UniProtKB/Swiss-Prot annotation:
Its EC number is 3.5.1.52. This is Peptide-N(4)-(N-acetyl-beta-glucosaminyl)asparagine amidase. Keywords: Cytoplasm, Hydrolase, Metal-binding, Zinc. Residues 442-632 form the PAW domain. It catalyses: Hydrolysis of an N(4)-(acetyl-beta-D-glucosaminyl)asparagine residue in which the glucosamine residue may be further glycosylated, to yield a (substituted) N-acetyl-beta-D-glucosaminylamine and a peptide containing an aspartate residue. GO terms for molecular function: metal ion binding; peptide-N4-(N-acetyl-beta-glucosaminyl)asparagine amidase activity. Zn(2+) binds at residues 247, 250, 273-274. The gene is PNGase. It is found in: Cytoplasm. Residues 33-96 form the PUB domain. The keyword Cytoplasm applies. It comes from Drosophila pseudoobscura pseudoobscura (Fruit fly). Its main location: cytoplasm.
Length: 632
């Protein structure tokens, strides 16, 4: 993990003083201009890392001398980024050994801070950079007791069977979630109000569907809908999937595994690329995962299960013998355990591993603060065949082992809690004996197709009713410009003057600045490191609209330029139009218009994937959607 010096970033920002309003504005303008120049310099390095010209800052350059280096603290920041200055030279140079990952992190946080100041916000402290994360990552997390102490308990099993011994170790490990200081930190990192608001909106939409007769399902519980929002936020914004750690020289993630070693309690994968070794720490300690926020399915499930506990869900960590880890959360409304796979952003689709992923399943166990359960039968529907595969221990001995672990976990529970757990366990065991047919979506290895879950995830008609109207800066420039990066899932409004771009506003997530959409979602391909907007699976068509309104001004459209990248396969078809509200495609001299994209066609089970908007690499810094409107 690459850390950056946030103090240097914060130091160059305008300070609250008793100076006049004009003086404060001058200081702010100087800061904005200096950071703009620095961002351009860093952007050049990132775009052409091997060009030595871009790694040199000449001190005889007037703009560098008068606008960048004149800002108090800027030289210290340059050193923090990695630039070096020697007395004999008249320049700063950025050595090749400074990693692109470090440069990118400084670029991201400086850009974010500048945008905040530009929009009028005056944040108290700089946010820690995180490409796909809206919540600042703390640099250090305090716990009540050290990690090893949190997961160490007296052994109760007397078996020599290593497989059974591992069950007790897994059960002990989840007890780290109950650290009060850790729980408080976790709660502070979750945007609970925002997620609850989204869940409430989805619930009201579903209530309308039920009232109109369009949906025959039972009204969902707000806590269940909040769980879906939490899963989506965690997968798309909070945690980052890592195949290989980035090379510190070239930034590539194609490095080869050289060896695995142990440092303290942490297993470390050592990769090599460009002759340099890089380390990927496979943390189990939640206090470390809340800082790094990256990993694979094990880290995903471990951290997500903990965050569920932060919101007081009864949650348990699920380990399978086929090398996959996920979460189960108890729904108090449905009185059953819900399967949640945070690394795949999937809720309530337990049979997908057996029927969609085609995995061989023999043992699956779930662990919580006061329970341990053999849940293999929830994830299979051919129980007799599965029993034939279970050869690691005697079934009777397995039951005795789980009972012993369960008793260990419940020894400090109240009589009332023990009675509740006993009743719940009995009902769960009865439910686990039932076999059911997989849904169509489980057969294809993806999330449940239930309308309630699709609606709660926003996978239906989504009306945000966001309309763009020119602000003061845009009116002054007679411009209305909007661009979108699918890699970062961010919109930017900006003005352009002689090639110089000034950011005005940013909007996080593709839904945030749309007018409406139907059957659209953002697909992230971790293996290929690509992102794009596509149709929902099993839908024949989709639509998304962005709307613009000039009626409250005396301006109209003079001309426009549109970059709108699409990709189709086979018989897939995408229609893109810029039109007035009454459907006319000539928008010059209009005061209202909209951009409309319609996706349709394709064949087979992956027809939805044959129409894609804004497909780009997750590392791309381009804007596949860029609309520039000139007004008069």
């Amino acid at each position: 993990m690459v850390d950056i010096n946030l103090e240097c970033v914060h130091f160059i920002e305008p300070k609250n003083t008793r100076s006049t309003e004009q003086q404060q504005q001058n200081v702010k303008n100087a800061y904005l201009e200096a950071v703009r120049i620095l961002l351009v310099l860093l952007e050049n390095v990132l775009s052409q890392p091997n060009n030595t010209k871009f790694r040199t800052i000449r001190l005889d350059n007037k703009a560098i001398k008068e606008k960048l280096l004149s800002l108090p603290g800027c030289e210290k920041l340059l050193y923090a980024i990695g630039f070096r200055h020697t007395p004999s030279s008249n320049s700063y140079t950025l050595p090749g050994e400074v990693s692109l990952q470090q440069i990118q992190k400084y670029y991201d946080v400086l850009r974010e801070r500048r945008t905040a100041w530009l929009s009028g916000a005056m944040p108290k402290s700089p946010a820690h950079p995180k490409a796909a994360c809206s919540t600042p990552s703390p640099l250090f997390i305090k716990t009540s007791v050290p990690y090893r102490q949190r997961i160490t308990f007296p052994r109760v099993l007397r078996t020599s069977n290593r497989f059974l011994q591992s069950l007790e170790l897994y059960s002990d490990a989840v007890m780290q979630y109950e650290d009060e200081l850790l729980l408080a930190t976790g709660r502070s990192l979750i945007p609970v109000d925002d997620l609850t608001s989204k869940a409430s909106e989805k619930m009201m939409a579903m209530q309308d569907l039920i009232a109109s007769g369009e949906c025959s399902e039972k009204e969902p519980c707000i806590r269940d809908l909040l769980l879906v929002e939490l899963t989506n936020w965690f997968n798309t914004q909070f945690f980052e999937w890592v195949n290989n750690i980035q090379c510190q020289v070239c930034g590539s993630e194609e490095s080869k595994l050289r060896r695995t070693q142990t440092e303290g309690d942490v297993r470390v994968e050592v990769n090599v690329c460009c002759g340099q070794e890089s380390k990927f720490y496979r943390y189990n300690d939640i206090s470390q995962l809340l800082v790094s926020r990256k990993g694979r399915c094990g880290e995903y499930a471990n951290c997500f299960t903990f965050l569920c506990r932060c919101l007081d869900y009864d949650a348990r960590l699920v380990h399978s013998h086929f090398d996959h880890v996920w979460t189960e959360v108890f729904s108090e409304t449905q009185m059953r355990w819900l399967h949640v796979d945070p690394s795949d952003n999937v809720v309530d689709s337990p049979l997908m591993y057996q029927h969609g992923w085609k995995r061989g399943i023999d043992y699956v166990f779930a662990y919580s603060r006061d329970d341990a359960q053999d849940v293999t039968w929830r994830y299979t529907n051919n129980h007799q065949e599965i029993l034939k595969l279970r050869k690691l221990c005697d079934e009777k001995e397995l039951i005795q082992t789980l009972n012993a672990i369960r008793e260990k976990r419940q020894q400090n529970c109240s009589a009332e809690r023990k009675n509740f757990l006993s009743q719940r366990n009995m009902f769960e065991v009865i439910g686990l004996t039932l076999e059911r047919k997989p849904t169509e979506n489980e057969l294809k290895g993806r999330s449940s197709g239930s309308l309630s879950w699709r609606q709660s995830r926003g996978e239906h008609t989504f009306t945000n009713i966001f309309v763009f109207s020119p602000n003061e800066a845009e009116l002054k420039k007679c411009q209305l410009n909007l661009r979108y990066s699918c890699a970062t899932d961010t919109y930017e409004r900006y003005t352009k003057d002689d090639g110089q771009i000034t950011l005005l506003n940013t909007y996080k997530t593709w839904q945030s600045a749309q007018f409406s959409s139907k059957n659209i979602y953002r697909k992230v391909e971790r293996d290929w490191k690509m992102a794009y907007l596509a149709r929902l699976e099993d839908t024949d068509c989709a639509e998304i609209i962005w709307k613009f309104d000039l009626t409250k001004t005396n301006l109209k459209v003079k001309s426009y330029k549109l970059v709108f990248e699409t990709k189709t396969f086979g018989e897939g078809k995408i229609d893109v139009s810029v039109q007035t509200n009454d459907g006319k495609t000539f928008i010059e001299n209009s005061s209202e218009f909209q951009v409309v994209a319609k996706l349709m066609g394709g064949k087979g089970d992956v027809a939805w994937q044959h129409t894609q908007l804004f497909r780009q690499s997750l590392n791309s810094r381009e804007y596949p959607f860029d609309l520039q409107v000139e007004l008069h």
